[in-house]
């Protein structure tokens, strides 16, 4: 995001919530991100974050109110990268920007993918399948050039990446690996690490 390689982000309430939890408390579901030590009552941290974001009124205002200076959502806000957060029936909260109506969420996602030239889906099965099903295989640029849209799915579970292929997204390239390793290798390849 910081280096301009992300033009849009599509995710669920969980990615944004846990990213903001990590930014604010340095925990993920109450465990320290780096040491994995549990914090006392840390399992409430994500709920505390949701309530603070809701009190602030938006993710951007929360970032300003609490001087958040790291994380995916921080980088999206700082760099004006649009994001679409869609909800699930089992979401905590959710955060203010989360679209709870499935059809409105799909419409917002379609609006983002129709502008894409490359789509990379990272370790979220339901969003990956939804995105794959709505991503066109080509795009016509303003000058009339027809350009393919590249679609990659990355997950440590081959069942997840193959599920998209099983549903007819034949243009998808699947990569079975740990997402963190994938991101680090790509970042090194781009020379940004």
Named regions from a protein language model:
Residues 1-56:
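Metabolite-binding pocket within alpha/beta catalytic cores that recognizes anionic/polar moieties
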Residues 33-81, 88-119, 124-193:
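C-terminal functional extensions of proteins
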């Amino acid at each position: 995001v910081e280096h301009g390689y992300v033009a849009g982000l599509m995710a669920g309430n969980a990615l944004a919530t846990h990213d903001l939890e990590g930014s604010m408390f340095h925990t993920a579901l109450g465990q320290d991100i780096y040491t994995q030590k549990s914090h006392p009552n840390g399992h409430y941290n994500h709920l505390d974050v949701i309530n603070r974001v809701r009190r602030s009124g938006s993710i951007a205002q929360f970032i300003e109110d609490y001087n958040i200076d790291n994380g995916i959502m921080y980088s999206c806000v700082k760099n004006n990268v649009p994001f679409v957060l869609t909800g699930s029936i089992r979401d905590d909260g959710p955060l203010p920007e989360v679209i709870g109506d499935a059809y409105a969420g799909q419409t917002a996602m379609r609006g983002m993918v129709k502008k894409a030239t490359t789509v990379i889906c990272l370790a979220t099965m339901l969003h990956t399948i939804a995105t794959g099903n709505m991503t066109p295989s080509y795009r016509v640029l303003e000058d009339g050039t027809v350009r393919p849209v590249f679609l990659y799915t990355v997950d440590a579970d081959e069942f997840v990446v193959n599920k998209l292929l099983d549903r007819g997204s034949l243009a998808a390239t699947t990569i079975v690996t740990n997402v963190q390793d994938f991101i680090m290798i790509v970042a090194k390849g781009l020379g940004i690490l």
